[in-house]
Amino acid sequence: MSVDTQQAPPEPTDEELAGLDAHWRAANYLAVGQIYLMANPLLTDPLRPEHVKPRLLGHWGTSPGLNLVHTHLNRVIKARDLDALCVWGPGHGGPAVLANAWLEGSYTETYPDITRDAAGMARLFKQFSFPGGVPSHVAPETPGSIHEGGELGYALSHAYGAAFDHPDLVVACVIGDGEAETGPLATSWHSNKFLDPVHDGAVLPILHLNGYKIANPTVLARLPETELDELLRGYGHDPVHVTGDDPAAVHRATARAMDTALDRIAAIQRAAREEGATGRPRWPMIVLRTPKGWTGPAEVDGLPVENTWRAHQVPLSAVRTNPEHLAQLERWLRSYRPEELFDDAGAPRPAVLAAIPEGPRRLGATPYANGGLLLRELPVPPLEKYAVPVGEPGASTHEPTRVLGDLLRDVMAATTDRRDFRLVGPDETASNRLQAVYAATGKAWQERTLPVDEDLDRHGRVMEILSEHTCQGWLEGYLLTGRHGLFSCYEAFVHIVDSMVNQHVKWLRVTRRLPWRAPIASLNYLLTSHVWRQDHNGFSHQEPGFVDHILNKSPEAVRVYLPPDANTLLSVADHALRSRDYVNVIVAGKQPCFDWLTMDQAKAHCARGAGIWDWAGTEDGSREPDVVLACAGDVPTLEILAAAQLIRHHLPELAVRVVNVVDIARLLPSGEHPHGMSDFEYDGLFTADKPVIFAYHGYPWLIHRLAYRRTGHAHLHVRGYKEIGTTTTPFDMVVGNDLDRYRLVMDVIDRVPGLAVRAAAVRQRMEDARQRHHDWIREHGVDLPEVADWTWEAPR
């Protein structure tokens, strides 16, 4: 249900505030217990060293603040009957979020052995950061989580991604003041310029200033309040402040701040949805300033702890061996008065549970945090409508991504009412030839517009901001809450999100073994404007290594595709858009490219992942080939086919096999990757003992790494990108990296037995062609006519 001021509750009574405090104290008690205890959860016996874990792990400092936020979110969710989700940026405060899930019952529903009684509490405590237990952060194992928060910077972009196209959802986002110093977080404040108050939900940022990181003060906590206010207002927010260290006063102030913020959200949404307001609203946020490690030990060993950086992790570190630490821990735990919070059986008392919402309204049970439950099949139209006609291989050209743009346009159109598909990118949609989508939807934009602007749309579903971090964060949040999307990016600059994709793959790998986590739509990358066609921008834009990075990740969760033409791109994209729980990387060109395969051939080839192009080679089946010319990627495919044509002309007696690889993981052994080939398959395709000249899109050593255990690896010779780049002609890029057709012919002559002497004159002609290229481009500034005007001639 959307926020509505008619549902705004009155200020909480003293009795209700006492109940909120009881809930907060219970959550704090449970958080401390998880960090320290493995037995005696209710302190029914005096605390002894054997009750304490031998290895103390976890983070206390942020936990009381997270517990405060969770407690007060419970109140407003229940009072206003809200659909809500919370993104916990300080994910190292896992004990707090786990404590609240246990209190509300969602944890027991997910893990029935962790019962809401003394025995279940003991198991909850022992399992935390314990071998065979649960991680220390707000990991995928945590009900209600879409954001682990281990690597900082992405909380707010995840929150906005969750809110897009969920008009009835309120996403609270706790931002630690340490995380607020990261670059991705700093940029993601601008997400409010893209939030549509008509079709999207609301994000309520809660900036938690507890003052310290691991060992240093935080920047924002030390700013004067007026300067901090100016900063946040400059970001487009309307901050509401809560400051204090007295629990009763802070509870009252937090309740008031939550109501104020939600009332403002309701007014913004009502103005946009009912009154037609179109100006960019100033969304509320809460600035919460409470002590780090609040309610914990004030001093330890004579040094201040509470409200200092020393409270960050484990304030009492020698509890098993230091009697004073043990006594201090017991006093700390008993300060929460657990006998008031839990009955004799260990169940939470009614006062603790009074403010907790029911059923799926609970933060740990919301279906929005288990997005696969909400996911619908994406209506991808039949590919035949978009297929380019191919009478003969290489007889025509198309721009592959432009062809894909037509498909994406119609996916956008088919989801107009559903609003569950988005395209994100860092100001590159048109550059990457996908602008056909603008016929179905515009670019999301809530700022003012000028007459020169094009395709801006307050209700658009194309998201463009020049921050790869924010693009990925938006898309991850969108996918994790049950929708579909595609991230289009220049190949060289997708490396900016290397670390983000690490975290997403880890998330997917864990969720695959959690039966209660429903599969989500895959994270799909379209990498274009790639290394071989960045001759105009130069060396800085030439970097094909993202594929290497991805293939280091969990094999069950990553896929890499290098379609060689428009129809194979359509087939790969169709597969990726329909898939679940993967990271799919598609590398494709946007420049005119020869059309090699019909749609039916493309589908079959992509299903195989790698195959012989018999129409391109000269083997007739009467004997094994003399050489295998292999390729992966659009430009390497062009150069391999041009080399095959040269060989056919100059060395017609050679039996040449041409192999194209579209799914690069096929090169791996089947035991190492689900898409890998058996040794029998590999040897059948590449032979066991014949030279293989492999033209690869990226760094050549990746192919060696993938195939190093194969029988014929000693005969494998790979050409690819060798970090030779500049602003030059397209063909000069491949010549500089020894990937050109002439070099490939020379490689064949050098590696097929008997050719070194017999074909020496041919080799010399290839060398001469490379020199002629060198001289020509330096005089004319363009490639040789024999290269620029080259066409494929079918074997006779």
Swiss-Prot record:
Top-level taxon of origin: Bacteria
EC number of the protein: 4.1.2.-
Span of the signal peptide: none
Keyword terms: Lyase, Thiamine pyrophosphate
Cofactor (UniProt): thiamine diphosphate
Pfam families in alphabetical order: XFP, XFP_C, XFP_N
InterPro entries, A to Z: Phosphoketolase, THDP-binding, Transketo_C/PFOR_II, Xul5P/Fru6P_PKetolase, Xul5P/Fru6P_PKetolase_C, Xul5P/Fru6P_PKetolase_CS, Xul5P/Fru6P_PKetolase_N, Xul5P/Fru6P_PKetolase_ThDP_BS
The keyword Ribosomal protein is annotated on this UniProt entry: no
GO biological process: carbohydrate metabolic process
GO molecular function terms attached to this record: aldehyde-lyase activity; magnesium ion binding
Annotated HAMAP family: Phosphoketolase (MF_01403)
Matching NCBIfam families: PRK05261.1-2 (NF003617), PRK05261.1-4 (NF003619), PRK05261.1-6 (NF003621)
Family named by the database record: Belongs to the XFP family.
Name of the protein in its database record: Probable phosphoketolase
Source organism: Streptomyces coelicolor (strain ATCC BAA-471 / A3(2) / M145)
